[in-house]
A protein has these predicted regions:
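Structural motif
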Residues: 50-58, 178-185
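A short beta-strand-loop structural module common to alpha/beta enzyme folds
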Residues: 38-51, 171-174
Length: 200
């Protein structure tokens, strides 16, 4: 993606039990600051600080792409991120802004499911943090059976794609508790953002 664009960055970091959410907050801030430095317009949402669902719908209409930042909890996103999706996406359906319908037609009700989104041309990207090593995602016979990071997040991609967006390359930080390498994570993430989004 090149030339100046408008991006929404959503921080799904969450303080809970033994985690304070600091790494995810830092990665979110890195995305915000890097995209701004590249010359793009950026709006941010920190889910833990609260949000107005109607204002969030307007951000989805405004943006060219959204960057989701979140930890991997129990093989998926935190409940606060799912709550955001349920509230904001549903608000956009009710107002016929994000989704018109489920894409099917009475003439052929078995075809076209998931094609009724109104955000065609927009994109989404996942940035996540996991204590699992990358091999747990990619290696055949390992925990995720070779599904890969995007395979584990298929449901999340599909929630976004139901709106009409298409996916950008995902980013993941691994071993974040067992062997944290924060400076490397941040350097790798900046490089990833620069490669995916480019300078405005």
């Amino acid at each position: 993606m090149r030339n100046k664009h408008e991006y929404s960055v959503i921080d799904g970091g969450k303080a809970f039990r033994f985690t304070e959410g600091r790494l995810n907050h830092t990665l979110h801030q890195t995305a915000r600051d890097t995209l701004t430095a590249l010359g793009h317009a950026v709006k941010e949402t920190v889910i833990e600080e609260g949000y107005d669902k109607d204002a969030e719908v307007e951000k989805w209409l405004w943006m060219d792409a959204v960057v989701w930042q979140m930890p991997g909890w129990w093989m998926g996103e935190p409940w606060t991120v799912k709550k955001y999706i349920d509230e904001v996406f549903t608000a956009g359906v009710g107002e016929n802004k994000l989704v018109a319908n489920d894409g099917r037609h009475r003439v052929n009700p078995t075809e076209g499911y998931g094609t009724g989104g109104l955000l065609h041309g927009k994109k989404h990207m996942i940035s996540s943090t996991w204590n699992a090593p990358i091999e747990a995602f990619t290696r055949e016979g390992d925990f995720f059976e070779g599904a890969g990071v995007d395979g584990v997040y298929l449901h999340f991609h599909k929630a976004n794609e139901f709106l009409g967006t298409t996916r950008l390359p995902s980013f993941i930080c691994n071993d974040v508790i067992k062997n944290p390498q924060v400076e490397r994570y941040l350097a790798d993430y900046r490089a990833h953002l620069e490669k995916v989004f480019g300078r405005g």
